Amino acid sequence: CDVTAAPTLIQKCKDAGNVPIIFFNKEITDYDVINSYENAYQVTSTGGDYGASIQAQMVIDYWKEHPEMDKNGDGKLQLVYLMGDPGHTASQPRCDYLKSTIEDAGIEIDLLAEDTGMWVTATAKEKMDAWVSKYGDEIECCVAGNDAMALGALSAVEAAGFNTDGEESSKYIPIYGIDALPEILSKIESGEITGSVLQDAKTQGQTIVKMAENLTSGKDAVDGIEGVETEEEAKAVRVPYQAITKDNLDLAKSTYE
């Protein structure tokens, strides 16, 4: 739901006899709202970076393991970044944490271009088409705020002759997304996409169901729930993000079984 609707939904639950409510996906960052009702909880992914630090670590690891990524040998990462909808709570943090994490690892970023792809494949392709036309093989890395935009970026670079044979391509731009959607996993397997971040919807769903069972049976909300983090102030149960590369595709695939 729209997080601004949370107070209204909470009031409805109070009026209905103090019915428990569990919010998920979009975090309610105004903790006064979530703490205004003892039977309100939220299930989200870990951290305020929305997976960007893990995404950045994949870029850092690739940079260190593949010296050829520094195409012009200047010691800087020539980066293009596709941001999500500016109105979404995850968009700016993903962008900011991505860049700060890379820079904190001692890698200087030369940001060639940054724009919003609005979470949409077609919009991201349009942006990347323009960037590839302008910068071509100067681009050393493309990072997108979600997988849909990463797929749009891939479509653009492949149309320009990049990434067509995965990492063995004569012209290659590492591309990273977030979500580890089923449609991107085959692209990671082929090397056309370099990595993604799993926002574990399966575990989130299982956690929500277990919490609902607990709350309706008078137990503590997180009783018997393992492998998650809790934050008392936010009344949040957080499911960890996971980096997904060729090396652990089975982890992502298992969430869709």
Where are the regions a protein language model picked out?
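Short glycine-enriched loops at secondary-structure junctions
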Residues: 25-29, 85, 117, 178-181
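Flexible loop/hinge segments that line or gate small-molecule binding clefts
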Residues: 9-50, 69, 73-75, 182-189, ...
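Hinge/cleft segment of the Venus flytrap/periplasmic-binding protein
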Residues: 75-78, 82-86, 100-101, 200-257
